[in-house]
């Protein structure tokens, strides 16, 4: 099956696993998915990230992170730029999610970075998603 929006698929799988409090979620791997998952790991939204090969398909195993009483660390994931409607921002228009409490993932000429890194680098780009 051909996937029209692999980023939305990644976010939906993580969102669904988060709602039912699964420990691990597995998704097909790609460079952009790895970059988004690495941002989630460095920002503290997931516990661990592992890449493995399942037959002929590269997969990502994402270990979800929860609080002491299984409360969710990720409260929201939202896809912003979609295949049917791309959303871009200039370097001075980089969005803030919940006044800096969340993270906007931006695809720039310097790679896929957070909104804070994009402001620090002085670059704009395509706003992929919000995580809070």
From Swiss-Prot:
Keywords: Ribonucleoprotein, Ribosomal protein, RNA-binding, rRNA-binding. GO terms for biological process: translation. One of its GO terms (cellular component) is ribonucleoprotein complex. The keyword Ribosomal protein applies. GO terms for molecular function: rRNA binding; structural constituent of ribosome. Gene3D superfamilies: 3.30.1370.30, 3.30.1490.10. It comes from the Bacteria. PANTHER family: 40S RIBOSOMAL PROTEIN S15A. One of the primary rRNA binding proteins, it binds directly to 16S rRNA central domain where it helps coordinate assembly of the platform of the 30S subunit. Belongs to the universal ribosomal protein uS8 family. Part of the 30S ribosomal subunit. Contacts proteins S5 and S12. This is Small ribosomal subunit protein uS8.
């Amino acid at each position: 099956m051909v996937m029209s929006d692999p980023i939305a698929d990644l976010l939906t799988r993580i969102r669904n696993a988060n709602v039912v409090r699964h420990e691990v979620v597995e998704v097909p791997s790609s460079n952009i998915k790895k970059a988004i998952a690495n941002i989630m790991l460095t920002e503290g939204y997931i516990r661990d990230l592992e890449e493995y090969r399942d037959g002929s398909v590269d997969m990502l195993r994402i270990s979800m992170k929860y609080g002491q009483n299984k409360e969710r660390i990720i409260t929201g994931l939202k896809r912003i730029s979609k295949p049917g409607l791309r959303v871009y921002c200039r370097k001075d228009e980089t969005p803030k999610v919940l006044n800096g409490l969340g993270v906007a993932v931006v695809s720039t000429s310097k790679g896929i970075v957070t909104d804070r890194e994009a402001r620090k680098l002085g670059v704009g780009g395509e706003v992929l998603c919000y995580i809070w």
